[in-house]
């Protein structure tokens, strides 16, 4: 009976610790410029699809708000947004959410050159369901920077990043100089 309880305790500890180990592997992939490891740990097609849907929804929602404030100009703007926004969002996300783009990001390159871990960027990390784990990221050097939430799910026997939740457009755009 003791062995069974010990085995159960070890399995639970391994299960609870595994997503944190995955965060460590992500950190190491970024620091070592390891594209293959990053591709194993992040489901890039899924992340891009989710991010495109989220960003397109935010852009169209903003266009609808403008239409309510300025009916004539807003109607034209909303129609134009519906026509142009999907292509702009898709091409932007496709260009920015790739292993190559992430590994060549200036912040990532700077940390890699200094051999500094990205652990400081994580402000929260915990389970939201038995097979779902989230972690919040924020630039520690910029206290007013927006928080981005990454979502990991248990895919077979490994944890993978499958989504990213970004703050509302107003918050993102207010930080642009």
Task: Tell what function each PLM region has.
Residues 35-65:
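Short extracytoplasmic
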Residues 22-37:
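Alpha-helical transmembrane signal-anchor/signal-peptide segments
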Residues 60-61, 69-72, 164-170:
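Short C-terminal domain-edge/linker segments immediately following a structured domain
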Residues 2-20:
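Hydrophobic membrane-insertion alpha-helices, especially the h-region
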Residues 63-142:
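Surface-exposed, charged secondary-structure patches
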Residues 110, 120-125, 132-177:
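Short beta-strand edge/turn micro-motifs at domain boundaries
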């Amino acid at each position: 009976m003791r062995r069974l309880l010990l085995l159960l305790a070890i399995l639970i500890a391994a299960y609870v610790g595994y997503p944190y180990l995955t965060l460590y592997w992500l950190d190491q992939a970024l620091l070592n410029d390891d594209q293959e490891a990053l591709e194993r740990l992040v489901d890039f097609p899924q992340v891009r699809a989710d991010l495109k849907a989220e960003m397109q929804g935010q852009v169209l929602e903003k266009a609808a708000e403008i239409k309510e404030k300025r009916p004539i100009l807003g109607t034209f703007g909303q129609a134009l947004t519906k026509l142009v926004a999907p292509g702009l969002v898709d091409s932007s996300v496709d260009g920015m959410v790739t292993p190559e783009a992430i590994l060549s990001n200036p912040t990532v390159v700077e940390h890699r050159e200094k051999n500094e871990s990205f652990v400081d960027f994580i402000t929260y990390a915990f389970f939201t369901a038995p097979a779902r784990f989230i972690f919040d990221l924020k630039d520690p050097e910029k206290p007013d920077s927006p928080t981005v939430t990454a979502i990991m799910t248990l895919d077979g026997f490994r944890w993978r990043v499958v989504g990213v939740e970004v703050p509302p457009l107003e918050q993102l755009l207010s930080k642009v100089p």
